[in-house]
A protein has these predicted regions:
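A short, acidic, flexible beta-alpha connecting loop/helix-capping segment that sits on the rim
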Residues: 256, 369-375
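Surface-exposed beta-loop-beta
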Residues: 203-204, 208-305
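Cleavable N-terminal export/targeting peptides
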Residues: 1-26, 169
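Extended hydrophobic-aromatic, low-complexity segments
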Residues: 285-288, 299-302, 320-329, 341-344, ...
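Hydrophobic, well-ordered secondary-structure elements that form the walls
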Residues: 312, 332, 355, 367, ...
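Outer membrane beta-barrel
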Residues: 26-46, 53-221, 226-230, 237-246, ...
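C-terminal closing repeat unit and adjoining cap/tail of repeat-based domains
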Residues: 352-368
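Outer-membrane beta-barrel "beta-signal"
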Residues: 380-392
Length: 392
């Protein structure tokens, strides 16, 4: 006959085993919330371009985002990212005013005015991923539908969680003439609505080969299509070493453009680019990125546009247990954007020098000196930009 103590012991062990098994099992759906908050200040001597750049100083919320990522099933992932961006101006502004009746015996009526338009609240990523291969295999095949970034430009596809240069393009307070601004305006970078196929192959635990093909409306973020054509993009990347990753992309952007005074719904402009990266943003040591982009703009003339940017940062970790800083990171960027290679005197060069202070791995304060110069006799712009960013 078993002793009561032994029975109790066996029962307890069984309960612990069942609890461990339950904890090891993944339940669906499961959703994780993350977010980011980024505050900016700038001061630039941009008075010569005030009609375009706005005031010479500004305090604003660059990004305030709550992100939801969920596994609906073992092979289905959903991701939604709304965003408030206070640095955006209202557009399509309309103002309507109403007046109360004039009081009996005379007096002043009450006038109420309301201004509406598109503000900084917008939907960024919103997509569903379906994996057609088993988890854990070296090769994985995915279908994505929804709104995502077009597969173009390595720095555009780098997360804004930790941008060593604060901005990908010229940013608020400067003229939008950096390479990222030019290719976004031409319809190649940033978000669009569509579908894409992606294949990932693990060379080893640290190296990945990726190929992506996508078809999109061509109109940009949250917009319906306007013609019977689609935009198409392709991008491939390969980690040639655990630290070095190279990539190339091609894009055909469609739209409706006036040609000889007649709307052309079959208009297409093209672009391509090559890029390379060493390390990752925020990792200890050196991080460097370079890319070259070339294409045609979305005008009847199809002017040749071109851009180059290179950046480097060195993340130095502080080892002292009493230090309130996690790391210090100096960074430098040069960006050259040309909106028409056939025209002399329209190229813009942006130089950015940054000193970053990591309060933790997820909180940074950066201060940058930026100088934007132009070919010809156009006055340059220079000044200071700061950013306080937190990811959670």
């Amino acid at each position: 006959m078993r002793s009561p103590k032994r029975v109790v012991g066996l029962t307890g062990a069984a309960v612990l085993c069942l609890a461990a098994v339950a904890q090891g099992q993944t339940t669906y759906p499961n959703v994780k919330l993350t977010g980011r908050l980024q505050e900016q200040f700038y001061y630039f001597n941009n008075d010569d371009y005030a009609a375009t750049t706005g005031p010479n100083s500004n305090l604003f919320t660059r990004r305030a985002r709550i992100e939801a990522r969920g596994n609906i099933a073992e092979n289905v992932v959903v991701y939604i990212q709304p965003s408030f961006e206070g640095g955006r101006n209202l557009n399509n502004v309309t103002t309507s005013c109403t007046s109360s009746p004039v009081p009996d015996g005379g007096g002043t009526p009450t006038i109420t005015c309301r201004t509406s338009g598109r503000s900084g609240l917008r939907l960024r990523d919103a997509w569903i991923d379906v994996r057609f291969t088993k988890e854990g295999t070296r090769g994985a095949f995915f279908l994505r539908g929804g709104q995502e970034k077009r597969p173009f430009s390595r720095y555009e596809l780098t997360s804004s969680n930790n941008l060593v240069s604060i901005e990908r393009g010229a940013g608020q307070g400067l003229l939008p003439r950096a390479s990222n601004d030019i290719f976004t305006s031409a319809g190649f970078a940033s978000h669009d609505v569509g579908a894409s196929l992606r294949y990932e192959y693990k060379l080893n635990d640290q190296q990945l080969l990726t190929v992506k093909l996508g078809a999109y409306n061509g109109q940009g973020e949250s917009l319906n299509d306007v013609n019977n054509k689609k935009s198409f993009g392709a991008r491939a990347t390969a980690a040639v070493t655990p630290k070095i990753d190279v990539g190339a992309n091609w894009y055909a952007h469609d739209g409706i453009t006036s040609v000889s005074g007649v709307p052309d719904s079959g208009f297409v402009n093209y672009a391509w680019g090559v890029d390379a990266q060493y390390g990752k943003p925020g990792d200890e040591g050196l991080y460097a990125l370079g890319e070259f982009l070339r294409g045609t703009d979305a005008t009847e003339a199809k002017n040749t546009i071109q851009g180059f940017q290179g950046l480097a940062a060195y993340n130095y970790r502080l080892k002292s247990p009493t230090s309130w800083l996690y790391a210090v990171e100096p960074a430098f960027r040069v960006d050259v954007g040309d909106p028409n290679t056939e025209v002399d005197g329209d190229r813009a060069t942006l130089i950015t020098g940054v000193l970053g202070f990591y309060l933790s791995s997820k909180a940074q304060f950066r201060i940058a000196y930026e100088h934007q110069s132009f070919q010809g006799d156009a006055p340059s712009i220079s000044g200071v930009r700061t950013a306080l960013t937190v990811n959670f």
